[in-house]
Amino acid sequence: MKRLIFSMGAFILLSLQWGGWALAEDLGRLSANPYNPESTSNPYGVGSPYRADSINNPYGPYGSPYSPKSTTNPYATDAPKLYDSQGNYRGRLSRNPYDPDSISNPYGRYGSPYSPDSINNPYGGGSPYAADSPNNPYGRGWRIEGTD
């Protein structure tokens, strides 16, 4: 009986945890590589302006200048999150200069040109030579996750 209750409890906890992961929508990779089909720089792949969930679609939830989930809205409150190839959080893909996690905040951890975690630091996270850097034209880039 104890084993059954323990198994059911573990199952419920794991399903709740996996259910939280299912809420994140994969929006591709922030990358300068135009040949990678998952790159936002590929106009025929994830970066297509006609794709409903593309950050390059000005009428979609992630590309509209009016959506709170948008990368182009300077007042966005729920912009997509960035993760590198090791799963480390790299800030929010947002033009909001006031959001502390935004890559557009020049004084924040993820937007400062002096922070090692910033995409704007050419010697840190934004190095054009790192294989997973978004600024490497032949690299993989960082994963973009939106919320449903």
Where are these regions (language model features)?
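Repetitive, compositionally biased segments used for assembly/scaffolding
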Residues: 22-148
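Bacterial N-terminal signal peptides that target proteins for export
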Residues: 1-8
